[in-house]
A protein has these predicted regions:
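Short, hydrophobic/aromatic-rich segments at coil-to-beta transitions
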Residues: 1-6
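Short aromatic-glycine-(Arg/Gly/Cys) micro-motifs in beta-strand/loop hairpins
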Residues: 10, 14-39
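A short, surface-exposed interaction/processing loop segment used at functional sites
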Residues: 31-42, 185-194
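A short, charged, amphipathic alpha-helix used as a generic interaction element across diverse proteins
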Residues: 44-62
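Intrinsically disordered, low-complexity charged/polar segments
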Residues: 62-82
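N-terminal domain-onset segments
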Residues: 78-144
Length: 237
C-alpha cells in the first residue's frame, strides 16, 4: 500500500510518497501538481525494507509532513503580509523566505524576505529589527564565542567582534529550531560560517517601502560584548 504525505508552509507545497514492492522501498517526491521524481532502493529482505519505510515515515512526520491522500490536499494559502502584525511567529516566517539556492549572493538570498517585510507597516519593520537584535543579543556570550571555529574567542588574543556578530546572524538565518538548539548548547555554533546579510533585511525593507534610510535604534544592542551577562569575566580580546 502506498502511503502519501504532503507539506505546506509559506514557501513550500510539496508531496512525498512511499511504498514497498517486494524487497524494494519506492519513494516519490516533488512539488504538488508537478511531475514526481522516483527513487528505488533494494534491501536483502522484505523485513529490512519495511524497517526502512518506517524510518523514513518517522523522519517525514518529524519534519512536519502530514499523511493524507494527495487528491484531497487543500490549496496552498499564500500569506497576506499586509494584514499581519509582527510577532515572533511572523519573524520566523519572514526568515523562512530566504532563498538559499542563491547562496553566495546575500542580497539575492534575502530578496523574498525583504519583499514580504516591505508589505508590512513601518512599525512592524522596526519590530522585526528589534526581534533580530534580541536574538543576536542572547547569543552574545563568551561560551558561544569560543565555539565558532578558527576565529574563536581566546582571552588575550585577537578576536573579531564583527565576525562573531556575522556568525550569530548565520544562526538566526538558519531558522527557529536551529537557533533554539544553538542558544541552548553553544557547542552547536556553526564553524567558520557567517551571514552578514541578515542585518540588511529590515533596512532594505524600510527603504523599499519609504524610499528613506532606516535610522531605527533597537532597545538592546546586538554588537559583540553588549550582553554583559554573557561575558561575566569581561573581555580581553
Amino acid at each position: 500500500m502506498r502511503r502519501e504525505f504532503y507539506y505546506q508552509d509559506d514557501t513550500s507545497n510539496k508531496f512525498w510518497t512511499i511504498e514497498l514492492q517486494g524487497n524494494e522501498c519506492v519513494t516519490t517526491h516533488g512539488k504538488i501538481g508537478a511531475k514526481a521524481r522516483e527513487t528505488r532502493k533494494e534491501f536483502p529482505t522484505a523485513e529490512a525494507a519495511q524497517g526502512e519505510l518506517e524510518k523514513q515515515v518517522a523522519g517525514k512526520l518529524k519534519k512536519g509532513y502530514i499523511e493524507g491522500a494527495l487528491s484531497a490536499v487543500p490549496a496552498q494559502v499564500k500569506p497576506d503580509w499586509t494584514t499581519m502584525t509582527m510577532s515572533d511567529e511572523v519573524f520566523w516566517s519572514i526568515v523562512r523566505l530566504f532563498n538559499w539556492k542563491k547562496s553566495g549572493d546575500d542580497d539575492a538570498v534575502i530578496k523574498p524576505a525583504v519583499a514580504a517585510l516591505a508589505q508590512m507597516s513601518e512599525a512592524d519593520i522596526a519590530r522585526f529589527e528589534d526581534t533580530l537584535a534580541e536574538k543576536l543579543h542572547a547569543l552574545d556570550t563568551e561560551a558561544h564565542a569560543r565555539e565558532i571555529g578558527e576565529e574563536a574567542y581566546q582571552p588575550g588574543k585577537h578576536f573579531s567582534v564583527d565576525w562573531f556578530l556575522y556568525e550569530r546572524c548565520a544562526v538566526v538565518a538558519n531558522g527557529r529550531d536551529y537557533y533554539a538548539a544553538v542558544l541552548a548548547d553553544p557547542k552547536q555554533m556553526p564553524k567558520d560560517l557567517e551571514f552578514e546579510g541578515m542585518l540588511s533585511v529590515a533596512p532594505s525593507a524600510h527603504e523599499r517601502k519609504t524610499g528613506h534610510d532606516f535610522d531605527h535604534v533597537t532597545p538592546v544592542s546586538y554588537e559583540t560584548y553588549s550582553n554583559t551577562a554573557g561575558w561575566p569575566n569581561g573581555n580581553s580580546g
